[in-house]
């Protein structure tokens, strides 16, 4: 699968680079391919781009993990050959581009709720509780609503420190989309977006920034790509899905969420899928090219 993706990536990026050079009157060959965007798939892209360069010695891929919003702006400004985003372009963004943009779904993954609580390595949360925490309505770990779904855990009388993204983020877009689905109050007051005005918590840049703050801060809670939690060995909460089951973000539960038919333009969401084993905070991520 990885070899196939590397080959497809070569064709996609070479086509993109040749189109850009042709439109600018340049050479049709190019040794450096530049991209920028989402931090969520960055660990995966690191491996893929490494394999791509090993298989194609004449090419170098430079990728800046600056967030989905930055990747979209960079593609619009023609400062990169490809952008990367965890949120597909909306109609306004499509209309702002200089040419037709192709969405290539490269991988799927899960956004996890990582936390740091000494002595607690198992926790359950619901979308409604996460919404209340980030709205500032629940501010203690031993709040009765959290305790009610974690009856066998001795939750501390400790303030919750929610951590969120400071940059334009596709991870934030998917996180806020999920909360807008499960919480009317969130939908009415916060809505969906790559960048939001947060009422409580600590801001950090990129998935690595949020993961780092969570790792260093007792009582913290943050939304990050599952690979970042795995790398830092951060515990993550089981989330209640639409079917009422508490599930972890695993290959099986994310795949269950992705059991959907993709439209022709590849723009699809798998947030809060209704499968009994589906992980509710699952997503596709895309490479964007002209």
Question: What do the predicted segments below correspond to?
Answer:
Residues 6-16:
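Bacterial N-terminal signal peptides
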Residues 17-290:
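Flexible loop/hinge segments at secondary-structure junctions
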Residues 1-4:
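Positively charged n-region of N-terminal signal peptides that target proteins for export
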């Amino acid at each position: 699968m990885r070899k196939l993706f590397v080959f497809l990536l070569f064709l996609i990026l070479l086509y993109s680079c040749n189109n850009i050079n042709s439109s600018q009157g340049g050479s049709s060959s190019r040794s450096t391919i530049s991209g920028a965007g989402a931090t969520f798939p960055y660990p995966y892209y690191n491996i893929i781009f490494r394999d791509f360069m090993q298989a194609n010695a004449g090419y170098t891929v430079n990728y800046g993990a600056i967030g989905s919003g930055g990747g979209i702006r960079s593609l619009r400004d023609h400062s990169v050959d490809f952008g990367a985003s965890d949120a597909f372009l909306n109609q306004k963004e499509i209309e702002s581009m200089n040419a037709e943009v192709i969405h290539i779904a490269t991988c799927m993954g899960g956004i996890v709720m990582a936390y740091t609580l000494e002595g607690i390595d198992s926790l359950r949360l619901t979308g409604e509780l996460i919404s209340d925490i980030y709205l500032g309505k629940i501010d203690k770990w031993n709040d009765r609503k959290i305790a009610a779904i974690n009856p066998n855990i001795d939750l501390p009388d400790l303030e919750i420190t929610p951590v969120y993204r400071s940059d334009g983020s596709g991870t934030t877009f998917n996180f806020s989309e999920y909360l807008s689905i499960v919480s009317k109050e969130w939908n009415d007051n916060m809505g969906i977006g790559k960048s939001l005005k947060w009422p409580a918590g600590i801001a950090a840049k990129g998935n690595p920034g949020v993961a780092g703050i969570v790792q260093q801060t007792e009582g913290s809670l943050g939304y990050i790509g599952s690979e970042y939690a795995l790398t830092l060995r951060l515990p993550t909460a089981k989330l209640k899905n639409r079917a009422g089951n508490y599930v972890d973000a695993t290959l099986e539960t994310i795949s269950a969420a992705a059991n959907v038919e993709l439209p022709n333009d590849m723009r699809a969401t798998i947030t809060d899928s209704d499968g009994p084993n589906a992980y509710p905070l699952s997503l596709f991520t895309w490479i964007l090219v002209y």
